[in-house]
């Protein structure tokens, strides 16, 4: 899955450092028999977490932190089911947080965070709550932005900064196609789809206040229809490369060669572009998201929070760590310096942060990847524009896995149709009768995205019912 590949990349980058931290913790535990510090276990994939832990322990000498680098909710679910080996503190992506809140796995921290609401962006603060109860603190955020290869756009005679509406984007895609380039690639990514529906004003999911009743309205939601119809048009006209899976080696190569000219992604993308497409340094720029009507609204794609598991026997120490990571200015600054995009308003309004024109690479070098652009100014505006009211499903992890086998079938049909058309055109051009005999089978009747959406909704309703939720038209 694309999310797993993304997390695996982060884990590979932090793995060696984290191993050192774990080793130090082990040595201290063996050598210092009189050590009376409270020990808390933290599960996190954040690359800068070892540095954050070091600073936290210096300021909180009564607490020792053991870091365990993990990704994938199957691990967490297995430990929850077994009832032992659980951490005290866990990092969760926003889309997964509701699942653990509804199932009673996260500690209610509402009383501990009085007055915190105005310190975070509306989108992230909304994402750590369920019906007014706060279950975690925002760690970072992923407001959507439009990243593009300016060199390629200029070759096609396009000013990407003037793309404000989806129609502008559509017209740009046609011009790029004329020079043999795709404006973007999408092989069926649930996180991208949900973010674009959110951007379009869609609110297809809702969970009742008691967490027992869930509404899935994908087939009737106006925002779902608005984006799906637009994206279907882009795919039907061959303007989106449906063959390349996000985060695949082939996708990165296409970004590097200019074959894929842009992408819609969260504000965490700059450091990943630098790491995965280093040859694009100086060529790429970022601007705000085009919207259906050109209005200034936005959505989140990605980002994570940190919460305390209700099973912990050390809630106070655990929350002190969460508070340091997500609320303390020094803890936030360390993570932002390591590449995280902030969720707090203080950092988003900081002059030094906004004036940044470089990204720090793995060797500590400052690289002007966006050609000297003050990219954080764009991303900070994007964060402020995020609309509130979006809810993820309390079984969102399952829903995203199921997306590929339902809505994903429309992408598979499009890819099969494209490959058949290319093979057919080559056969006609070359007049090769032998090649004609080896043509792939035609893809059959078209499978549209709305066909897949209908199937996805039926799957989600069936799954939710089997999980004990009351599935309703209006929760």
Regions found by a protein language model. Give the residues of each.
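Glycine-centered hinge/linker elements that transmit conformational signals in sensory
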Residues: 173, 213-244, 285, 289
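C-terminal lobe and pocket-closing loops
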Residues: 269-280, 294-301, 308-405, 471-475
């Amino acid at each position: 899955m694309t999310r797993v590949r993304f997390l695996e990349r982060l884990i590979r980058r932090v793995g060696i450092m984290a191993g050192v931290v774990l080793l130090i913790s082990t040595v201290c535990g063996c050598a210092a028999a009189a050590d009376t510090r409270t020990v808390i276990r933290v599960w996190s994939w954040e690359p800068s977490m070892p540095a954050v832990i070091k600073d936290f322990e210096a300021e909180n000498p009564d607490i020792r932190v053991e870091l365990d680098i993990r990704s994938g909710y199957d691990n967490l679910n297995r430990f929850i089911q077994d009832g032992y080996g659980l951490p005290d503190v866990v990092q969760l992506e926003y889309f997964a947080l509701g699942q653990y809140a509804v199932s009673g796995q996260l500690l209610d921290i509402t009383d501990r965070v009085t007055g915190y609401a105005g310190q975070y962006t509306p989108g992230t603060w909304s994402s750590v709550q369920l019906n007014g109860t706060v279950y975690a603190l925002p760690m970072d955020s992923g407001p959507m932005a439009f990243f593009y290869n300016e060199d390629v756009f200029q070759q096609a005679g396009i000013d990407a900064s003037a793309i404000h509406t989806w129609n502008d984007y559509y017209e740009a895609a046609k011009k790029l196609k004329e020079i043999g380039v795709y404006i973007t690639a999408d092989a069926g990514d649930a996180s991208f789809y949900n973010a674009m529906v959110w951007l379009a004003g869609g609110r297809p999911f809702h969970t009742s206040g008691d967490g027992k009743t869930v509404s899935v309205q994908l087939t009737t939601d106006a925002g779902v229809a608005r984006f799906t119809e637009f994206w279907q048009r882009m795919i039907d006209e061959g303007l989106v490369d449906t063959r390349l899976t996000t985060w695949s080696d082939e996708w990165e190569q296409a970004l590097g060669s200019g074959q894929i000219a842009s992408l819609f992604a969260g504000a965490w993308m700059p450091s990943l572009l630098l790491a995965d497409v280093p040859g694009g340094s100086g060529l790429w720029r970022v601007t705000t998201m085009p919207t259906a009507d050109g209005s200034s609204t936005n959505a989140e794609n990605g980002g994570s929070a940190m919460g305390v598991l209700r099973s912990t026997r050390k809630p106070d120490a655990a929350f002190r760590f969460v508070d340091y990571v997500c609320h303390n200015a020094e803890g936030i600054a360390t993570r932002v310096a390591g590449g995280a995009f902030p969720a707090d308003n203080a950092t988003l309004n900081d002059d030094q942060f906004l004036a940044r024109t470089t990204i720090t690479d793995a060797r500590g070098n400052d690289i002007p990847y966006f050609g000297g652009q003050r990219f954080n100014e764009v991303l900070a505006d994007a964060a402020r524009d995020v609309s509130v009211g979006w809810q993820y499903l309390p079984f969102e992890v399952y829903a995203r896995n199921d997306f590929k086998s339902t809505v994903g079938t429309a992408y598979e049909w499009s890819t099969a149709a494209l490959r058949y058309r290319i093979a057919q055109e080559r056969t006609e051009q070359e007049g090769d009768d032998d090649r004609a005999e080896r043509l792939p089978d035609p893809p059959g009747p078209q499978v549209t995205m709305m066909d897949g959406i209908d199937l996805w909704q039926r799957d989600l309703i069936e799954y939710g019912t089997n999980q004990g939720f009351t599935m309703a038209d209006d929760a």
